[in-house]
Amino acid sequence: KGCNLMSDAEYEKRATMFGRSLHRDNRSDKELLDEALAVAAKSDVIVAALGESSEMSGESSCRTNLEMTDTQRILLQELLKTGKPVVLVLFTGRPLVLNWEQANVPAILNVWFAGSEAGFAIGDVLFGDVNPSGKLTTTFPKSVGQIPLFYNHKNTGRPLADGAWFQKFRSNYIDIDLSLIHISEPTRH
């Protein structure tokens, strides 16, 4: 495994509050790293599958830091120190800030959050059977400040606390006395 998504278990829990697809390994970061390095020592090429969980992208899932998480960056640095070729297979639902990775990792394959056939497609690319010639639908920024601000107003109260959901919703037609409505010009709709 190499590492957990994040070193802080509580933050990891909040980051994946809309789905619990992550299964945290309770071993220490050092134990996980040592295991990954032992496997890497027996390998000719290292394929590091890193990035975000799918729950970290989408509504109410904003991050102030769009770099790789601390545990993943440490794992990647240690894998590169082995001197073996490293391919970063990046799973993400949004552009990340990858300045360090771009400068240090020989090959980065961005696979987004692919579907059930992703393993076959990624394998075809890694083994050279298919050229990864797709065009990116977005630009990966050099810093968070380069990303346009689309949500520039106060938080609406989400995410809700564990177990708290909207309890009631009501929708009604409103009866209005039409004699009170005055239209100055004809309207079209």
Summary of predicted features, one role per range:
Residues L22-R27, T64-E67:
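Short, flexible loop segments at the rims of nucleotide/cofactor-binding pockets, characterized by
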Residues E52-T69:
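Glycine/threonine-rich flexible loop motifs
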Residues K1-L5:
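Catalytic alpha/large subunits of respiratory electron-transfer oxidoreductases
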Residues T82-V86, V105:
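A short helix->loop->beta-strand "cap" motif at the edges of active sites that frequently abuts
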Residues S43:
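An anion/phosphate-binding loop that grips the pyrophosphate of nucleotide cofactors and donors
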Residues E31, E35-A38, D70-I74, E78, ...:
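Extracytoplasmic/secreted proteins, especially bacterial periplasmic and envelope-associated proteins
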Residues M6-R24, F91-S184, R188:
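Secreted, periplasmic, or luminal enzymes acting at the cell surface/secretory milieu
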